């Protein structure tokens, strides 16, 4: 390795190590209650995201609703091979609701991204129908 590049690689490595904990997102596994309901409140930091996920089977329906203290980007997605599919996607929403109709067995994720400069308080509710 060229000795002139060593300081650059060292500084780049240190920067990645220092930044890694701050880049951590909040990933949450859904835990349904006996009535098929899931409720959660959290805070999404600036430039971070929160993701709530669960494996769902075909025929299931999930009614979802959320309210945030400021606009966020929102989506419901799943991965199919290398492709990402989005049954729902909204930008700049402070609240929304809808129903996810599950057509294939996948891990579905409800995701909120905070593109703002301040923390956003988020309250969400999911209700699963078998």
Regions found by a protein language model. Name each.
Residues 2-10:
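Bacterial N-terminal signal peptides that target proteins for export
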Residues 12-13, 23:
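Cleavable N-terminal signal peptides
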Residues 19-20:
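N-terminal signal peptide c-region/cleavage motif recognized by signal peptidases
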């Amino acid at each position: 390795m060229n000795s002139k590049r060593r300081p650059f690689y060292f500084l780049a490595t240190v920067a990645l190590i220092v930044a890694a904990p701050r880049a951590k997102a909040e990933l949450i596994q859904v835990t349904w209650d006996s009535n098929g309901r899931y409720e959660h409140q959290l805070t999404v930091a600036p430039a971070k995201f929160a993701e709530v996920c669960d494996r769902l089977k075909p025929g299931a329906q999930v009614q979802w609703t959320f309210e945030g203290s400021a606009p966020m980007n929102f989506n419901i997605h799943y991965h199919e091979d290398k492709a990402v599919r989005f049954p729902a996607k909204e930008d700049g929403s402070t609240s929304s609701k809808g129903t996810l109709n599950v057509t294939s067995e996948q891990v579905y994720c409800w995701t909120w991204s905070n593109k703002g400069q301040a923390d956003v308080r988020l309250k969400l509710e999911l209700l699963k129908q078998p």
